[in-house]
UniProtKB/Swiss-Prot annotation:
Signal peptide: none annotated. [4Fe-4S] cluster binds at C354, C357, C360, C401. It comes from the Bacteria. The keyword Repressor does not apply. This is NADH-quinone oxidoreductase subunit F. Keywords: 4Fe-4S, Flavoprotein, FMN, Iron, Iron-sulfur, Metal-binding, NAD, Quinone, Translocase. Belongs to the complex I 51 kDa subunit family. It is an enzyme of class 7 (translocase). Its cofactor is [4Fe-4S] cluster; FMN. It comes from Buchnera aphidicola subsp. Baizongia pistaciae (strain Bp). FMN binds at residues 177-224. SUPFAM superfamilies: Nqo1 FMN-binding domain-like, Nqo1 middle domain-like, Nqo1C-terminal domain-like. NAD(+) binds at G62, R63, G64, G65, A66, G67, F68, L69, T70, G71. Binds 1 [4Fe-4S] cluster.
Length: 444
């Protein structure tokens, strides 16, 4: 049965301001509910070093999928001096294109000022005057809400010159993307923002030293930045106490796919996937059986029913062979062909490859071709062997960025748990070697 907890500022720092209809919280209501108090506290009573230290103590990790410590990332920015210059940038990664993921859109459309306040506090910590929100181009309504919120924040004196009576200047700009998944990678995002082709960059140099227009740059996710204000309002001890695991705070989590009540909820780290699946999402719809689930987007490995009791956090999901990712899970019922499902996923990643490196550019289309052959049940035994070889050749360290390694995770896990389904797609009467597959690479 679907049963939701009541939201309070002590238990749900990201969503407690929402009413029952989940209307957008504009600045008057946001300020009435302690909005911008954290930013005022930071500007009037803290130094940038104090802010970074507090975020380090909080244990806040990036919510974009990698789970890198936010305070550590901020501390990597070089000092203001003649060597590194006095101009630096903060970029908010709002290019949310992971299939099945909509947590950032939810936060931007429902509590936009929470994001703006998080950006302002972060900008203060990093000595940044200009910040950019790199927004997914298809999020037209989100863009409208953010633009209106920026106008409101400017009118209330939180953006512009002499913010909160200080000598500080803060500006926030919105840049809409052109619909490329690869822009979720921070250096590809930077290239796109500069007007270049959205290819990932070589590292080093890292963006913290050579980023946007060659200046020190920090890139943070929407949900990461939205967490920041509450930490300064309620303290580190409180923030750590929200979680049921070593990962601190709460996380926007959800379930989609073949569940009764697909949705998104703010929940503590460490809650089990089963509790989300059964208590919040209501279990499988139409009395169907769960076949597989992905814990955090299309680029995360498949897990099966026995893994539902795993705590939803970065460490424990990794222990069972997947990644927490965006923490918006997808449930798949037993009527779905695993070969067709993987083919669908790989087609997306093949299409979204930037084409910069050969393994990704040629390997992903090759995988799609093989899966289409298997889907038609005209494959040969060598097809499965080649898929396994491609999983190895497109793995970590073999490609320029993490796009291909992430893309093949669903395939690797599908071969692990459902190899028989792949084998049943092989034509048992075929004595022909896979000439079609071997020759197909010449097309790319």
């Amino acid at each position: 049965m679907k049963k939701l907890l009541s939201r309070t500022s002590e238990t749900h720092p990201l969503t407690w301001r929402l009413n029952a209809q989940q209307d957008t919280v504009w600045i008057k209501e946001y300020k009435r509910k302690n909005g911008y108090r954290a930013f005022e506290k930071v500007v009037n009573h803290m130094t940038s070093e104090d802010v970074i230290d507090l975020i380090k103590q909080s244990g806040l990790k990036g919510r974009g999928g990698a789970g890198f410590l936010t305070g550590l990332k901020w501390s990597l920015m070089p000092p203001l001096n003649d060597e590194y210059g006095y101009t630096r940038y903060l970029l908010c990664n709002a290019d949310e294109m992971e299939p099945g993921t909509y947590k950032d859109r939810f936060l931007m459309e429902k509590v936009p000022h929470q994001l703006l306040e998080g950006i302002l506090i972060s900008a203060f910590a990093l000595s940044v005057t200009k910040s950019y929100i790199f927004l997914r181009g298809e999020y037209v309504n989100t863009e409208r809400i953010l633009k209106q919120s920026i106008i409101e924040a400017t009118n209330y004196g939180y953006l512009g010159k002499n913010v909160c009576g200080s000598n500080l200047t803060f500006e926030i700009f919105i840049h809409t993307g052109a619909g490329r998944y690869i822009c979720g990678e921070e250096t590809a995002l930077i290239n796109s923002l500069e007007g270049r082709r959205a290819n990932p960059r070589f590292k080093p140099p890292f963006p913290a030293y050579v980023g946007l227009w060659g200046k020190p740059t920090c890139v943070n996710n929407v949900e990461t930045l939205s967490n920041v204000p509450a930490i300064f309002l309620n303290g580190v001890k409180w923030y750590k106490g929200l979680s049921k695991s070593l990962d601190t705070g709460t996380k926007m989590m959800g379930f989609s796919g073949s569940v009764k009540f697909p949705g998104i909820w703010e929940l503590p780290f460490g809650i089990t996937a089963r509790e989300i699946f059964e208590r919040y999402a209501g279990g499988m719809k139409n009395n169907k059986k769960l076949k597989v689930w992905q814990p955090g987007g299309a680029s995360t490995s498949f897990l099966i029913d026995k893994h539902l009791d795993v705590p939803m956090d970065f460490v424990n999901i990794k222990k069972v062979g997947s990644r927490l990712g965006t923490a918006l899970a997808m449930a798949v019922d037993d009527s779905v062909s695993i070969v067709s499902l993987v083919r669908n996923i790989e087609e997306f990643f093949s299409r979204e490859s930037c084409g910069f490196c050969t393994p990704c550019r040629d390997g992903l289309p090759w995988i799609v071709k093989i899966l289409k052959v298997l889907e038609q049940k005209i494959g040969v035994p060598e097809d499965i062997e080649i898929l396994e070889q491609l999983c190895e050749q497109l793995g970590p360290g073999r490609t320029f960025c993490a796009h291909a390694p992430g893309a093949i995770e669903p395939l690797k896990s599908a071969l692990k748990y459902f190899r028989l389904e792949f084998e049943l797609c092989v034509n048992s009467n075929s004595t022909i070697k896979c000439k079609y597959i071997h020759s197909s690479i010449s097309e790319y």
